[in-house]
Regions:
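N-terminal targeting signals for export/organelle localization
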Residues: 1-50, 177
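A short beta-strand-turn-helix
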Residues: 52-73
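Thiol/disulfide oxidoreductase modules built on the thioredoxin-like
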Residues: 122-126, 132-176
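Conserved redox-active cysteine motifs that mediate thiol-disulfide chemistry
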Residues: 69-70, 77-94
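Structural microenvironment flanking redox-active thiols in thiol-disulfide oxidoreductases
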Residues: 86-124, 132-139
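Hydrophobic beta-strand anchors of alpha/beta hydrolase catalytic cores
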Residues: 74-75, 103, 148
């Protein structure tokens, strides 16, 4: 093989190696990109987008989950008669001191009217929005309370669980960033 042929073979090998490296880098980048939020399906479990359920505020005005886009949202499904829910409220009071978190509590028991719930909210020192919706409980398949959802700024559920400690909340929220 003459010198010119060796140069062409070496040049072809270098071009092929560089092309492969560029392609593999592009492929790796595609696999590590976070998916477009719009492509994430709606659902009620971790990893899905919150369905935009309308719940009724104590003032009678509608509240939508999408009202909280751009903020980390903690959704607390609860009822006034539920002792663990009252304990969860104590944790949520501490959590409400964070400026990067919004909290929305949803009463799931239709037996309680807005007058009672307003008094309950004030007695429990809840400074966030308390709403009432048995339909939302059905939509989100609430089988026990307190049920807690934490959604990121794009409305994607990052945590679903029951009674949640302040330490656990802080860890979840810090992971969301």
């Amino acid at each position: 093989m003459d010198g010119a042929a060796k140069k062409y073979i070496m040049l072809a090998f270098i071009v092929l190696t560089l092309s492969s490296a560029v392609y593999l880098g592009w492929l790796n980048d595609q696999n590590t990109q976070t998916p477009d939020t719009e492509s994430i399906p709606f659902g009620v479990e971790k990893g899905y987008r919150l369905r935009d359920v309308e719940v009724t505020g104590l003032d009678g005005k509608p509240v939508l989950f999408s009202d909280y886009r751009g903020s980390i949202l903690v959704v607390d499904f609860m009822a006034p008669w539920c002792s663990p829910c009252k304990e969860q409220i104590k944790v949520l009071i501490q959590l409400s001191q964070r400026t990067d978190v919004e909290i929305l509590s949803i009463n799931v028991d239709p037996e309680y009217n807005s007058t009672y719930l307003t008094r309950f909210r004030d007695d429990e020192e809840m400074t966030w929005t308390l709403t009432s919706s048995a339909d939302a409980a059905v939509e989100y398949k609430v089988t026990a309370i307190p049920l807690i959802l934490v959604a990121d700024r794009d409305g994607v559920i990052r945590y679903k669980g029951y009674y949640t400690t302040l330490t656990n909340f802080q860890q979840i929220i810090d992971e969301i960033g």
